[in-house]
Regions:
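Juxtamembrane helix-capping/reentrant segments at transmembrane boundaries
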Residues: 32-48, 102-112, 176-183
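Membrane-interface helix-boundary motifs at transmembrane edges
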Residues: 68-71, 96-105, 133-137, 170-171
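Transmembrane alpha-helical segments that form the membrane-embedded catalytic/substrate-channel core
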Residues: 15-28, 84-94, 116-124, 149-167
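Membrane-interfacial catalytic/cofactor-binding modules of polytopic membrane enzymes
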Residues: 133-147, 151-187
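Hydrophobic alpha-helical segments and helix pairs
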Residues: 72-127
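Residue-level detector of conserved catalytic or cofactor/ligand-binding positions
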Residues: 186-195
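N-terminal signal-anchor/initial transmembrane insertion module
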Residues: 1-60
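Helix-coil boundary and interhelical linker segments in multi-pass alpha-helical membrane proteins
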Residues: 1-7, 58-79, 118-144
Length: 195
C-alpha cells in the first residue's frame, strides 16, 4: 500500500506542476475572469460548499474507519485540518458578499482536488505512516512549531478573506486588487519588486 501511496504523491506533484504551467497560458475561468466555457454558472456560495466539503467529509470518513481514531497525535492533526476546512467549506461561503457565480467545471475540479487532498493527508495520518511515527510527538518541539505555523497561516487566511470581502461597498460590482495586510507585501515586493 505504501508503494501505491508514493506513486499517488508523485502524480499529485506532477499534476501541480502541470497546472502551474498551464495557468501561465490559460485564464482561469472564475472570479472576474468568469467564462461559461468552463461550465454552467453556479452561485458562489453553493459552489464553495460543493467544492470544499468533500475534503471535510472524506477526512471524517478516513478518520472514523481508522484504527488510529483516538490516538492523540493523529487526532490533534485531524482537529487542525478539520478546523481549517470547517471554516473554508461551511463558514466562508456564508460570509461571501455579492451574487457572483462560478463555472460548474471549476467546482468539479475543486471537488476532485479536495477529495484527493483528503486521501493524501488522511491516508498518511491514519493509514500509511509507521506505527511508531507519532511516538513522543507532544514532547518534541516540531509539533508545536508546526502547530504555531498552522495557526499563523489560519489567522493570515482569515484576515485576507476579511480584506477581500470588504473591498467593495454594497452594490459595487467593480474589480479591485487588495492592498492591505500581506496583500500589501505581495504587491510591493513580489508584483513590483523595483518599487
Amino acid at each position: 500500500m505504501a508503494a501505491y501511496f508514493n506513486i499517488f504523491l508523485i502524480v499529485m506533484a506532477l499534476l501541480a506542476l502541470a497546472v502551474y504551467i498551464a495557468l501561465h497560458y490559460f485564464e482561469a475561468g472564475y472570479g472576474y475572469l468568469f467564462n461559461r466555457k468552463y461550465g454552467f454558472p453556479i452561485p458562489n456560495r453553493i459552489g464553495w460548499v460543493l467544492m470544499e466539503c468533500p475534503v471535510f467529509i472524506a477526512m471524517t470518513v478516513l478518520w472514523l474507519l481508522s484504527d488510529r481514531t483516538w490516538e492523540a497525535a493523529p487526532l490533534a492533526l485531524l482537529i487542525l485540518f478539520q478546523g481549517h476546512y470547517l471554516q473554508r467549506a461551511f463558514i466562508f461561503p456564508l460570509l461571501i458578499r455579492g451574487n457572483s457565480k462560478m463555472p460548474a467545471g471549476i467546482v468539479g475540479m475543486g471537488m476532485l482536488f479536495n477529495t484527493l487532498n483528503a486521501l493524501m493527508q488522511g491516508g498518511w495520518i491514519f493509514y500509511i505512516s509507521p506505527a511508531d511515527y507519532y511516538d513522543g510527538w507532544f514532547s518534541k518541539p516540531y509539533f508545536y512549531i508546526g502547530a504555531a505555523l498552522f495557526v499563523a497561516g489560519m489567522v493570515i487566511n482569515l484576515h485576507s478573506d476579511y480584506i477581500i470581502r470588504h473591498l467593495r461597498k454594497p452594490g459595487d460590482t467593480r474589480h479591485y486588487l487588495p492592498a492591505k495586510g500581506l496583500y500589501r507585501l505581495s504587491l510591493i515586493h513580489i508584483s513590483e519588486p523595483t518599487r
